[in-house]
């Protein structure tokens, strides 16, 4: 109950790929956040309807290029095969760095930790990622732990769809602190 009070009205933005975001990695954390009173905005590289790998259809609220980090308490990068569109994207890197520099919560799940790793956020930080992208985050300086969900300060990473629920719960807990 107390955690619910403390996160009520906080704001999170979840960044999804235009195509092939991973359904549960958006929908499960979003549900957990909203159930706890967090206001969630969905952002993507297009305002057209986005399609998940398993067929979920989601209409983004805003373009990710229009994200103003100051408006949010948490910035969350959602995974799925399409998430690689942000790996080398300078705007995605700027959003990650702006959020980190402002001590906002930064979350990334599945292959999305590569985006924040390439932005420089995971250097000497404990982190996890999807099995196929372990070397990508290690080469960017991350200390890979292999955990389902890993937290190092304001940065929360998760390994994939099976960890989506726990990822959401960990974000809520961090927002309540």
Where are these regions (language model features)?
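Extended, subdomain-level signal for the structured scaffold at the beginning of enzyme domains
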Residues: 2-102, 106, 115-121, 134-146, ...
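Catalytic nucleophile serine of serine hydrolases
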Residues: 110
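Anionic-ligand binding patches
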Residues: 127
